Amino acid sequence: MASHIGKLPIEIPAGVEVTINGQEFAAKGAKGSDSYTIPEGVTAKVEGNEIIVTANDDLRPTRAKHGLARSIVASMVKGVHDGYSKSLDIVGTGYRAQMKGKGIEFSLGYSHTITVNPPEGITLELPNPNQVIVKGTDKQAVGQVAANIRKLRAPEPYKGKGIKYSDEVIRRKAGKAGK
């Protein structure tokens, strides 16, 4: 019984260069490059224009790592070819953001401003003062930076003020019932 996800082949798009050296996997594409150490018990090989990830045995932990490794490798190949992005909206009177060097300075109703500097490989864009776009080749890093920005002022359920993902729907609550 193999991992359902792990046994799917990964197609290598045109313009992406893949190298496998033992347990080290590296992908290079138009948007950048990324590398990953494949876990013990799992091997990857290139056959034609596909990457095949296989488990060395049928033990439960190996099957779990098999699916994980295949998903991460597929995310890397997509990331170096297309890149990943997450869009956040800033909702609330007086809440805004402005570029400061490579980082962004947020005014979120606190007594001070908050500056967020992106890690290596992540870029922050500001199409307007109420929208932030996080871009990069690493899916996990893009999601983590977006989550850290959202955490600065999470949306509250009464008026919906705060930083939310663009596709997120905030569950609203009714206020106190008047007499």
Swiss-Prot record:
Signal peptide (UniProt feature, chain positions): none
GO CC field: cytosolic large ribosomal subunit
PROSITE patterns named in the record: RIBOSOMAL_L6_1
SUPFAM superfamilies linked to this entry: Ribosomal protein L6 (SSF56053)
Keyword Plastid in annotation: no
Statement: the UniProt record of this protein carries the keyword S-adenosyl-L-methionine: no
A biological process from GO: cytoplasmic translation
Highest taxon of source: Bacteria
GO molecular function, one term: structural constituent of ribosome
Keyword set, alphabetical order: Ribonucleoprotein, Ribosomal protein, RNA-binding, rRNA-binding
Family per record: Belongs to the universal ribosomal protein uL6 family.
Assembly notes: Part of the 50S ribosomal subunit.
Protein name per Swiss-Prot or TrEMBL: Large ribosomal subunit protein uL6
